[in-house]
């Protein structure tokens, strides 16, 4: 249960990657959020039952994909590359992500941010984000040289501008 959002949570499948990218961005940018910065992601659920169901289903799915026989079965049953949602489904999709920034020294400074995307998150919106990152790399003068950078640390504010202008993302501060 997440006390800040007042909802039950379950693991978010992309958290294993996203959390590392966010923490690396903090380090590459010189720790603007502090060296004690913490970041985590979870899926908000409507009820305790839904949180338990989603957690169990995700765990069973991961175990099944780790075992040879069930992985082979899953490969036969799950969609193949290129067999994802239809164009209509991608265009009808959307998502909302809520972030809560917590200032442990003064909780009155906590901030809630909502990000909304106007397409399916797994296909449409991700493709737009990748496309706008490519435009930044091709057209903008970057403040960084070669190496392994995160989008936030290499693409600066131009990327955020492109995401809101051309990729269908809306960033909104709800509480501050």
Q: How should these model regions be labeled?
A:
Residues 1-176:
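C-terminal catalytic/substrate-binding lobe primarily of soluble NAD(P)-dependent oxidoreductases
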């Amino acid at each position: 249960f997440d006390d800040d959002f007042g909802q039950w949570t379950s693991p978010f499948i992309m958290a294993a990657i996203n959390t590392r990218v966010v923490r690396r961005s903090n380090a590459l940018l010189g720790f603007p959020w502090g060296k004690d910065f913490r970041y985590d992601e979870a899926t908000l659920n409507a009820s305790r039952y839904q949180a338990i169901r989603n957690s169990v289903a995700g765990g069973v799915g991961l175990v099944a994909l780790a075992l040879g026989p069930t992985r082979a079965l899953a490969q036969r049953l799950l969609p193949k590359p290129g067999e994802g949602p239809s164009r209509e489904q991608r265009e009808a999709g959307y998502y909302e992500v809520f972030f809560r920034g917590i200032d442990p020294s003064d909780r009155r400074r906590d901030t809630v941010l909502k990000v909304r995307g106007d397409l399916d998150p797994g296909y449409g919106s991700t493709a737009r984000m990748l496309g706008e990152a490519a435009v930044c790399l091709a057209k903008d003068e970057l403040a960084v040289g070669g190496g392994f950078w995160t989008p936030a640390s290499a693409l600066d504010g131009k990327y955020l501008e492109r995401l809101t202008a051309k990729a269908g993302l809306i960033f909104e501060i709800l509480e501050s």
